[in-house]
Swiss-Prot record:
The lineage of its organism: Bacteria, Pseudomonadati, Pseudomonadota, Alphaproteobacteria, Rhodospirillales. GO terms for cellular component: ribonucleoprotein complex; ribosome. This is Large ribosomal subunit protein uL4. The gene is rplD. One of the primary rRNA binding proteins, this protein initially binds near the 5'-end of the 23S rRNA. It is important during the early stages of 50S assembly. It makes multiple contacts with different domains of the 23S rRNA in the assembled 50S subunit and ribosome. The keyword 4Fe-4S does not apply.
């Protein structure tokens, strides 16, 4: 599959062949869903916590005798039916991570790349380099490309000037090739790869 290569001035500077085994797979919504849920689960801090009956400060004395008062029997004022009492089966500090095999994770990344290519939302840039770190200059160039929500993936080594210019532009993310992931690809409308990124992704995912 061939696609055109453009520069930041929206000028066509060549063509590149995209490997079908990386950019030509059928869309698998089930695989993408599993991968996104796996990523979001790993991001959760899991610091949620409520106190059980053994953790609440207070007396352990029985509030009133068992029989003879006419009231319902109670054994502790720390029970959940009392104000300030415990919560039963409440959340505890834990990890939300779950397993997902490398084979599925690799397939999910290739599927995400293929989905963007099939939708016509995959652009290839000659290079992600900026002459100045000024955001205004880069924003104007991206406007000529029609990019309002995009993820730009470059090679292993990012251009520091480009990153500084791009980091204050809303709805724009810049990642190195090794940071490419399904969640960030899908959350932006357009995926922009540099020529270096294409070569390195194909070498890693073939």
């Amino acid at each position: 599959m061939k696609t055109t290569v453009k520069n930041l001035n929206n000028e066509t500077v060549g063509e590149i062949e995209l490997a079908d085994e990386v950019f030509g797979l059928p869309t698998r919504q089930d695989i993408l869903t599993r991968m996104v849920l796996w990523q979001l689960a790993k991001r959760r801090q899991g610091t949620h916590k409520t106190k059980g009956i053994s953790e609440i400060a207070g007396t352990t004395k029985k509030p009133w005798r068992q029989k003879g008062t006419g009231r319902a029997r109670q054994g502790s004022t720390r029970s959940p039916q009392f104000r300030g009492g415990a919560r039963i089966f409440g959340p505890v500090v834990r990890s939300h991570e779950h397993d997902l095999t490398k084979k599925v994770r690799k397939l999910a990344l290739k599927t995400a790349l293929s989905t963007k290519a099939a939708e016509g939302k995959l652009f290839v840039l000659e290079a992600a380099k900026a002459d100045t770190h000024k955001t205004k200059a880069l924003a104007a160039q991206l406007k000529t490309l029609g990019l309002t929500s995009a993820l730009i993936i470059d090679g292993a080594n990012l251009d520091e000037t480009f990153v500084r210019a791009a980091r204050n532009i809303p709805h724009l993310d810049v990642l190195p090739e090794q940071g490419a992931n399904v969640y960030d690809i899908l959350r932006r409308d357009v995926l922009v790869l540099t020529r270096n990124a294409v070569e390195q992704l194909e070498a890693r995912l073939k």
